[in-house]
């Protein structure tokens, strides 16, 4: 298994956010790219009152603690000025982790041969959820092989990249070894408390 070529930080994501998370992504993504990082995912949850989780990485898939700190220092003031949350929130900056989301075609290429869970936004032959070994994309599709397919059912599917709603790697011993070899094991999260403008201290 060989590493896929590095992709430019501006490779477009296949899977993007909606609502408030989409607004956060719109604010922070240009600055992340300016620092040499690329956005993986934004999530806004009700954890700890309100938590904004921003997942980022370098184009080679690495993300150190120092990288998380640099990202936090840069984007925290941007979020304070634009105030997309509208209330006090807890900011978390993290690496994608070993069982990372797959949000770009390059992610599927980089981790070809590893196990992943994929959920389609549009059903294929009556099903939306797949778990199996992903292959490198070919054009607009990516193949997923299903080792545990029942007799009489397809052992693989060609999934349209544009139809993927969510995808992430499955944590396995092989994946852990490969992540450590590549130096893409997760960095410690950088966390901070942020108040919406005008909120009491």
Curated annotation (Swiss-Prot):
Gene Ontology biological process: ribosomal small subunit assembly; translation
GO CC annotations, alphabetized: cytosol
Region Disordered, annotated ranges: 180-201
Annotated InterPro entries: Ribosome_maturation_RimP, RimP_C, RimP_C_sf, RimP_N, RimP_N_sf
Keywords: Cytoplasm, Ribosome biogenesis
Location of this chain's protein in the cell: Cytoplasm
Domain of life: Bacteria
Family membership: Belongs to the RimP family.
Role noted for this protein: Required for maturation of 30S ribosomal subunits.
PANTHER family: RIBOSOME MATURATION FACTOR RIMP
Protein name: Ribosome maturation factor RimP
Organism this protein belongs to: Methylobacterium sp. (strain 4-46)
Organism taxonomic ancestry: Bacteria, Pseudomonadati, Pseudomonadota, Alphaproteobacteria, Hyphomicrobiales
